[in-house]
Amino acid sequence: MNTLAFQTLRALADGAFHSGEDIAGGLGVTRSAVWYGIRDLNAAGLRVESVRGRGYRLDCPLSLLDAGRLREALGDRAHVFTIEIADRVDSTNSALLARAAQGAPGGLVLAAEQQLAGRGRRGRAWRSQIGHALTFSLLWRFARGARELAGLSLAVGIALARALRAAGAAEARLKWPNDVLLPSGKLAGILIEMHGDMLGPSAAVIGIGINVRADAAVSAAVDQTVADLETAAGVQVDRNRLLAALLRELHDVIGIVEAQGFAPLRAEWQSLHVYQDQPVSLQLPDGSALQGLACGVADDGALLLQTNGLVSRHHSGECSLRAAEAVK
């Protein structure tokens, strides 16, 4: 969407009726421009109701991202992060990787209402509707090299699960290496990309996408079942408060990883793993699969797979884990 459409969306975000005249006056544009903004919102899949004599309203209120409200919700952690909110970007991860290469400091957060080329793991596209998901990336700098941060993705999963459970998704579980699931489908995902030396100082761009509100178009466009936080919680979710809670949890687990590695978090991760001690199929990069029992993870985040009494270690790479009964 263009800038005018986003301005119009902010004017309507509360879900109340607003006259075209009031919207135009508030934005400093013509009534005709407002009409075009409404048209673009509808074209983007955001349903705007028009009633003669009352004006326009969204069919459901939206919690739009706001840097000021986010900093307020962060409280005593606000100084840790530099917050940037964008209407639209190609990819928050790509943007922060470029910023990392330019020397941007750690603690930089970029959240976007719309990603035009959002990315997930294994090259998959991340699809979301404007205002219905929480998509952001965090740049963090480490004195350690990337080789010593092998368990970072799993630590981030713990932070994500903690925040989502606190927000009402009590049944949120982790799936190795980077997904958060509910019984009804995938709730959130993680994509971590490294910049810097394998042995020396490094930077991680931690990308997270959360399905906050159900969206039929998004569900139809992806090849897996999708869950959402508002359905699980039974209430409308304030995305600014959710992001603040998640950033606080991320700050906590990153501090542990920096000081001690993933090992202190291993037991908690295993307690949240949806396939812990369950029969699974591990899909390997060459297309083959290993059947076995998911018996935990190692201190470096490697999956421990028991097959015929022997335990093997597998790092995430391009591997994919499924329940054994889901494999045909």
Give names to the regions the model predicted.
Residues 87, 174-176:
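Short loop/edge segments at beta-strand edges and connector loops
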Residues 79, 104-106, 176, 185, ...:
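Short, basic and Ser/Thr-rich N-terminal targeting/leader segments
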Residues 2-166, 237:
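N-terminal lobe of the biotin/lipoate ligase/transferase fold
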Residues 179:
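Conserved active-site carboxylates
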